[in-house]
Amino acid sequence: MYEKKIPKDLSCGLNIAIEVIGGKWKSNLLANINKGIKRPSELHKSIPQASARVLNQQLSELEFHGIVTKKIHNVLPPKVEYSLTSGGESILEVLYAMKSWGESYKKTFHEIIKYEG
């Protein structure tokens, strides 16, 4: 089994939060699920620049960490829906605060991030 050379520091709450919600599309997924977009195909349409494989991987990670729940309906064709858990709902306030911070400093960081490689 693969073992990371540098173990994750889980003694800090911030590191744990970043580990759970730190993914390129996780904040978008959580915001869209909160808006009522619950099916994987709808989530992919709402984030077209992300591949379905990556979105499914990140949804699986969010489910594993207890941030979202996945409900599989027993119908044909199969129907899957995601919803936020109480942990997922509680992280929204943090995500929206980060969004507000980003909006406030957008001009400051836009050029730096644009040319960051």
How should these model regions be labeled?
Residues 71:
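Short beta-strand His + acidic residue motifs that chelate non-heme Fe in jelly-roll/DSBH
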Residues 74-98:
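Basic, amphipathic "hinge/linker" alpha-helix immediately C-terminal to the N-terminal HTH DNA-binding motif
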Residues 8-54, 74, 81:
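N-terminal helix-turn-helix DNA-binding core of bacterial DNA-binding proteins
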Residues 2, 31, 89-117:
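Amphipathic alpha-helical dimerization/coiled-coil segments
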Residues 58:
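Residues within the DNA-recognition helix of helix-turn-helix
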